[in-house]
């Protein structure tokens, strides 16, 4: 207790002093002094308030997600439960800490299923399986980079046909929670941002109220949101909620940014749709990631197996009174897997028990994922550890150990366990479970080397070659995915040289070529430098009479999609040093592989490789001097036949025994393989990619092919390859 407080309490017990002339005069002086001090305090308080308002943003009130209906309407809800009052259909609202659909109490039992990870021909199949699990809602991201891969180049067809996906959800009576970003995370390249944002100068401040960034977001949402307005529930469609950003509290603290997104969404979607945020169930994260009150509905996610109810109690603090139905908007059924790790698995009964904790007390949950699908093309994301160099790219499969497997299988323990729990909390009987789709192994496929990558450089359009004094990033030369070849020259010396590339994203294969030597048509592999390991490489003494050409082939293995290092440019991002001196004079040659959503679908470089299947293989040696298949990036092609149309079924291509590369089946990029690192051995090939008769497989092997030059088409997945073997 302070001395001042102790003295004040003592005075209270001694009673008032006797009033004399002296004490009266003294009291008068004290009164005047108090008035003077009061005026001084008010002056400084006013100055402090002005300073506070000058530096702290004051936002205009945001519209409530429930402001369109009145208290009398809320009372109607309670009556409708007993079917005494009819309510206009097409309303999805929150009141009394519950969801209300057309006036009826409603519980969300949903699941994430991303249309861009499943071929359109299989959308209905996967949705019906989700429905058989007992789900009533589908949640999906919308990746900006899929729909606008180049500035102003819009793609809303094929696997990017969001409108058709929404129509199908509506047809199957599945509600939708839409997550349009602009940032989505989702183990998707760059968190869904288009890579061309990285080429803008000065650099954008992503996920912020930076005006340059917001102008681009305004433009993108100005294209996207009008397309989905007709599908809002209040307009007769399936969309019941639209998410603002994604787990923003784990990244930043910029309320002006969140307010801008809310106002932008309201401007396009109107005041009736519920806007929501998703953040981890932590007070500090929620403070930064959402907006208190009823402008948005704050939802939470948390580790599966955590006690959900203290987190739901915390959730209520960030929502307006009566506006916080408990909802875990990402209930994790499994987890992601990086290259070099064991395949992530979670126990079926443990997962089902965790879901039971939520549903048993009338909570809602969205399974992340109900069906993972596949990172086709070059769209896999990546994570970092303690720093930017601790780089971990995701595998091609996004199976996620979800109840519906990558290939759609449902005959598994997790599907059954979750369905049993959901069935206990669903009034209507669940739909019957479809059987697994058929799988077919088409056997061994003999490959032949058709062309070395370097042999095809003459087919690159000269206008696409960029020259610069110093290396440029992939984004700066317009190569957003795949590979970029850097070429320079240096003067040889008598002993070895040391090459240093301080910053390369993500993996560089180094080759040299002495033009004065006989049979020097093709560069020789020297070694590799990557983001994780040593940045130096010894270059052998070539004893070359001319300058030596240095070739550095850089692979973009997937941009970081989460955390502080999402501004993840690719290519050589620093000077290149040779024996301590900067190497100048560079050519950069894009290697034009198509990504998932590119038009036209025919890949020019693949067609060139196929056309040279005879001439190149006969004119050039396939092996080095020691008789081994040379470690130079090369194209291999193979053919397999499907005799009858009814034999066209899903298959898996096994790359066991091969090194690292990409695979294309019938001009469709099925993704990356890396069995030498693991754990994924086989790539999934959905049946719609295949055709009756001849099917063509083309692979670019970067490291070393199997000596037999054989791969196998099998009827099952396999995640037991590499040093991190797992069943």
Regions found by a protein language model. Name each.
Residues 1-39:
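Short, low-complexity, Lys/Arg-enriched N-terminal segments of secretory-pathway carbohydrate enzymes
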Residues 107, 134-136, 170-176, 233-240, ...:
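Short, well-ordered coil/turn segments that N-cap beta-strands
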Residues 6, 12, 41-48, 214-228, ...:
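Carbohydrate-binding surfaces of carbohydrate-active enzymes
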Residues 82, 87-121, 128-132, 158-165, ...:
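Extended substrate-binding grooves/exosites of carbohydrate-active enzymes
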Residues 496-514, 550, 640-666, 673-674, ...:
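Aromatic-lined ligand-binding clefts that engage carbohydrates, nucleic acids, or primary amines
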Residues 122-191, 195, 262-272, 387:
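Aromatic-lined substrate-binding rim segments of carbohydrate-active enzymes
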Residues 236-323:
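Gly/Pro-rich turn-and-neighbor structural signature
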Residues 114-133, 151-170, 494-503, 529-535, ...:
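Aromatic- and glycine-enriched glycan-recognition loops and surfaces
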